[in-house]
Structure formats: structure tokens, C-alpha cells
A protein has these predicted regions:
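Conserved N-terminal beta1-alpha1 strand-loop-helix module at the mouth
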Residues: 3-175
Length: 175
């Protein structure tokens, strides 16, 4: 599993891939990771056949990330069986023990409006390989396409932080 931030100024994960053509295009354009939503309430939910087809056609190594929101143990294990080198991203209220129980690198997501609890969060999920800060809100878990105030990003542990939400060609240099 790649997910290494060493010698890398920007790690690019394109999330919400739901068709083979888009996934391969993102790979060809230099993405470091592709994210697949495994939350059935999301309009970007994807069945496992799509990432399987993409993985079969990749001509380079990149991270495959599966995004879950409060999944069952069975849901996560099914993905791990089919994609043993994948990375799991937990985007709900999963307990740290649950996230750790699969013995894999994982990303723990939380919303920018909870940044005041950053230190507690890092302590609670100390086994997380990275933290994803998203601009989600109390209604929508993520995928809002809205940027948050990046000045709020904690100054410590920056190598473990992935920023999500509203990033585009006109504002990415502000990160």
C-alpha cells in the first residue's frame, strides 16, 4: 500500500469515481489515488465491479481507497478480500477500535467544523495513517464541493493531513 507522503508536496486523491473511463483518465493525468464511495446513501456510491475493471486496466501503481460511512464489519471485509492492497477511509462515527480491527492502513475523516477538537481526535485515532479534513456539514457527510477556511488546518502533523472539499485549479496553490 502506497499512501506515503515522503518526498511529495501534494498527494492527489480523486474521490467519487463511479465509472471506468473517469478512473483511468484520472490515473493518466497523474492522480496518486482513486477513491470509491461505499456508502449507499451517496449519489456517488459504486459497485465493486467498477474499481475491479479500473484496477485491471491500470498501467501504473496508485492507491485504491474505499470510503465507508459507519459500515458493518462484513462490508469492510468484503472489500478487503477483493482488494487486499486497498486503503480504507472511515468517514462516519466509527470507533477507533473498529477502524484498527482490520489491520490495514486507514484514513480517518472528520469535518472542518470540528477542527476545535483536532488534538482529541488525533489522540483517539492515533493509529490512523492519515486524517482527511472535509468540508462536510451536519446533513451531508462529504462530497459537498465546497472549500473550508484552510487557515484552520492544524499546523502540527501536516504530513498526516489530507484536505478535501472544493479544491480546484484556481485555489489549489493556496494550500
Amino acid at each position: 500500500v502506497h499512501l506515503s507522503f515522503e518526498n511529495m508536496s501534494i498527494y492527489t486523491k480523486i474521490c467519487g469515481i463511479n465509472d471506468t473511463k473517469s478512473g483511468l483518465l484520472c490515473s493518466n493525468l497523474g492522480a496518486d489515488a482513486l477513491g470509491f464511495i461505499r456508502y449507499e446513501k451517496s449519489p456517488r456510491f459504486v459497485e465493486l465491479d467498477v474499481p475491479l475493471k479500473i484496477q485491471e486496466n491500470l498501467d501504473k501503481e496508485l492507491d485504491i481507497v474505499f470510503v465507508f460511512v459507519n459500515p458493518s464489519e462484513k462490508e469492510v471485509k468484503t472489500v478487503i478480500e477483493k482488494f487486499p492492497n486497498s486503503i480504507i477511509q472511515f468517514h462516519g462515527e466509527e470507533p477507533a477500535e473498529f477502524c484498527e480491527s482490520f489491520g490495514k492502513k486507514y484514513i480517518k475523516a472528520f469535518h472542518a467544523y470540528n477542527l476545535r477538537y483536532w488534538k482529541n481526535y488525533m489522540d483517539l485515532y492515533s493509529s490512523a495513517h492519515a486524517f482527511l479534513i472535509d468540508s462536510g456539514n451536519s446533513v451531508q457527510k462529504g462530497g459537498t464541493g465546497i472549500a473550508f477556511d484552510w487557515k484552520l488546518i492544524p499546523k502540527t502533523e501536516k504530513e498526516k493531513i489530507i484536505v478535501a472539499g472544493g479544491i480546484n485549479s484556481s485555489n489549489v496553490s493556496d494550500l
